[in-house]
Amino acid sequence: MKEQKLIHEGVIIESLPNGMFRVRLDNEDLILGYVSGRIRRSFIRILPGDRVKIEVSRYDSTKGRIIYRLRNKDSND
């Protein structure tokens, strides 16, 4: 049986080495996020201030996988 993941939205606070990011979730929790392979393969650039969807395990709620970068309303891309 596959493990159920919780999906949250948050804002990138800080960029760390090796594709890791500090993310503040909408419920004010700070967690460590890493970039999923699909985002890495697609060369999607994630910068501090970007809103992202992050998948968090039930067993370790301090780490999560960034699965989607949400579009900013004020950007042109």
Curated annotation (Swiss-Prot):
One of its GO terms (molecular function) is translation initiation factor activity. Residues 1-71 form the S1-like domain. It is found in: Plastid, Chloroplast. Transmembrane segments: none annotated. Keywords: Chloroplast, Initiation factor, Plastid, Protein biosynthesis, RNA-binding, rRNA-binding. Its main location: plastid. The keyword Protein biosynthesis applies. One of its GO terms (cellular component) is cytosol. The keyword Phosphoprotein does not apply. InterPro entries: NA-bd_OB-fold, RNA-binding_domain_S1_IF1, S1_domain, TIF_IF1. Component of the 30S ribosomal translation pre-initiation complex which assembles on the 30S ribosome in the order IF-2 and IF-3, IF-1 and N-formylmethionyl-tRNA(fMet); mRNA recruitment can occur at any time during PIC assembly. One of the essential components for the initiation of protein synthesis. Stabilizes the binding of IF-2 and IF-3 on the 30S subunit to which N-formylmethionyl-tRNA(fMet) subsequently binds. Helps modulate mRNA selection, yielding the 30S pre-initiation complex (PIC). Upon addition of the 50S ribosomal subunit IF-1, IF-2 and IF-3 are released leaving the mature 70S translation initiation complex. Belongs to the IF-1 family. NCBIfam families: infA. PANTHER family: TRANSLATION INITIATION FACTOR IF-1, CHLOROPLASTIC. This is Translation initiation factor IF-1, chloroplastic.
